[in-house]
Structure formats: C-alpha cells, structure tokens
A protein has these predicted regions:
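Cyclophilin-like peptidyl-prolyl cis-trans isomerases
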Residues: 25-274
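Bacterial N-terminal signal peptides that target proteins for export
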Residues: 1-11
C-alpha cells in the first residue's frame, strides 16, 4: 500500500502545483473581476494592515506584568495581561489589583500546563492551610450572578446610545419597556467602530466585539445580558466547586481551542497581549 500511495501523492501534488501560465492568468483575472474570493488573511496580516484608527491606547493601570524565571539560555520571560474594563468582572479585577499591591504572586509558580487548554498559576500550597500564602483581608466575594452584566450596567462608552431612556411603548392592550437610544453623531460613529455584531453561535444568541473585547449577548432591550467569552489568550479565575467563584489569586490563560463551555461558569478578567 505504501508503494502505491506515495507515487499517487506525488502525482496529485504535481497536478496542483504545475499549472500553465495561461491557467494562472485566468485565475488572477477571475479574482480581479470578483468572481472568486481572495484567500483569507492570516492574523499577522490583519494586524499589519489595520489602520491607525483601529488601535486603542491601553491605560497603564489596566496592565498586569508578570516576569517569569529566565529560560534555559538565560533569556528574560515576561507576560503582559490587559485587565477587563468596568463593568465586566469588576469585583475580580478589583481583587487582582489588591493582590498585585500586596505582591501576592512574587515567588509563586505555574502549577498546571495542559496542552490545547490552559496554563494556570498561583499558590501551589493554596489548599494546605499551614503552608498557604495569606490573602489580603479585604478581597471581595462575588456571587455567580456577576458572570453576566446587565445592559443597565454598561457605561456609555461601551453602549451605542449616547443617552438611554426607558419609554413605555404601547403594544396591543399591554405595555412593554424598550430602550430608546438618542445617540449623537459622534457616539454613532464611535459605536460603528467599536461594536461588531456577528452571527449566533452554539453558546449564545449573539456574539460581538464591544470596545475590542469579545462578548456574548442574550435577551433584548432592557433584558439584555452580556458576558465575556473564552477565546485564545483570555485570562480567567480559578475557583473551587460552585457556588465558589474564586478570588483572583489563581489565574489561567487559554492556550488552545476556545473552551466556550466555561462561559458564565468561570469569571474572565483579561487577556494576554504580549508574551
């Protein structure tokens, strides 16, 4: 079987590669005429071609810098994480700022590396009360309801309406509440740039980018709820069994296929932007 398959593979490859100049010219003309779609861009190409207006300056206070031990050749290793802006995961990111202020992670370790899933770090002795590192006393405890953010909690800069009012609109014999946006032209332009509504997926009614962050949406009008979604490079909070939601002392980063089943089961607090 091997002696048969190898020549066949070579013949097939040759048939694909050795196209005549006329065939290549015809394909180029078809693409130029719009009859065929160009090849999708690679992530690096998308970044390289992004216009200046698509970039946003990250506030320094939203950056979490983690320096690891040098590698085997003595090369420094640094990971830079951007924390999520309010109102998303606000309690957990607040805890992380307190943990950084207390230098909680200094000298701790990466405790878990699972290929195509996550890398997790924190206090390896956290479950041993005699050896566990003390946590700051004023850390918040968040309920599971904080995994989602209601539309009323969204700050104006993340909502496409400059002013949001609740109006009672008659519908048949009943009334219902609906959001009535009154955006200025400036806000409309900003919303068009920041908000990228996409299709439905298996885990949410809609998914979109809002202010550059990947979010899922469920519900409409004043009942709408938003939550961050697990994508490559997103940083989340390790926790114990429900209803525990974690403090932020144990963190992980997604390093493989997006584990979307973790959405609204674990808090997301940021994303790796370098390292």
């Amino acid at each position: 079987m091997r002696t048969i398959h190898r020549p066949l593979a070579a013949l097939i490859a040759g048939a694909l590669i050795l196209q005549s100049p006329a065939a290549l010219a015809q394909a180029s003309a078809a693409q130029a005429a719009g009859r065929t779609k160009p090849s999708p861009l690679a992530p690096g190409e998308i970044v390289a071609q992004a216009p200046e207006g698509d970039w946003a300056e990250i506030p320094p206070e939203d950056l979490l810098v983690m320096d690891l031990e040098p590698d085997a050749k003595g090369k420094p290793r640094r990971v830079v994480i951007q924390l999520m802006p309010a109102p998303f995961s606000k309690g957990w990111t607040g805890n992380i700022r307190k943990l950084v202020g207390a230098r909680f992670w200094d000298g701790l370790s990466i405790n878990r590396v699972q290929d195509n899933y996550v890398v997790q770090w924190g206090d390896g002795n956290a479950e041993d009360k005699a050896k566990a590192r003390a946590l700051p006393a004023d850390l918040e405890v968040m309920p599971e309801s904080q995994y989602e953010t209601g539309v009323k909690m969204l700050e104006e800069e993340y909502f496409f309406a400059g002013e949001v009012v609740f109006a009672e609109t008659p519908k048949t014999a009943k009334y219902r509440k609906q959001l009535t946006p009154k955006p200025s032209k400036e806000v409309q332009a900003r919303a068009k740039r920041l908000s990228r509504v996409q299709e439905r997926d298996s885990y949410a009614e809609y998914v979109q980018f809002l202010g550059g962050w990947p979010l899922a949406v469920e519900g409409k009008y004043d009942k709408a709820k938003f939550w961050p979604v697990h994508c490559y490079g997103m940083v989340g909070v390790g926790r114990d069994l429900s209803p525990n939601t974690g403090t932020g002392a144990e963190l992980y980063v997604v390093i493989g296929h997006a584990p979307r089943h973790l959405d609204r089961n674990i808090a997301l607090v940021g994303r790796v932007i370098e390292g």
